[in-house]
Design a protein with these regions (language model features):
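Sec-dependent signal peptide recognition
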Residues: 2-8
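C-terminal motif of bacterial Sec signal peptides marking the signal peptidase cleavage site
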Residues: 14-17
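Ser/Thr-rich, low-complexity intrinsically disordered terminal regions
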Residues: 19-127
Length: 127
């Protein structure tokens, strides 16, 4: 009885500490209306900075975003045009990414949604 109880408690503890993986969330060609005097590149760079992402322009039309927080690391590619952008998973560390199932720790999706909202906010600003 004690052994069974111990096994059940251990299993419950492990299950409580593990979050299930979620499908990787990508933003595909999101169209935005830019505020006066704002470029898409400016909106992406400012939106990333607002959410503590390190953003770097790779070439015209492509920005790479990198986030490192509490031992977790993610990198996204952000291709963009004059009035749209995408956020695409590039790589991660310590996020339990499963390439075959294209699944990842759910925090990744939350970070991408927050980045998306920040970019949209910056795009709508009037400078």
């Amino acid at each position: 009885m004690k052994k069974t109880l111990g096994i059940l408690l251990t299993a419950a503890f492990l299950a409580a500490g593990c979050r299930s993986l979620a499908p990787v969330y990508n933003i595909e060609n999101k169209t935005v209306v830019l505020g006066s005097g704002v470029t898409m590149e400016q909106a992406i760079l400012a939106g990333g900075a607002a959410k503590r992402w390190t953003m770097s322009a790779v070439r015209p039309g492509l920005i790479k975003g990198h986030l490192y927080t509490r031992g977790h690391e993610v990198t996204v590619n952000i291709p963009y045009t004059q009035n749209s952008y995408s956020i695409e998973y590039a790589s991660s560390d310590n996020m339990r990414y499963n390439a075959k199932k294209h699944k990842i720790h759910p925090k990744y999706n939350q970070w991408v949604r927050n980045l998306d909202l920040a970019i949209s906010r910056e795009a709508a600003r009037v400078h």
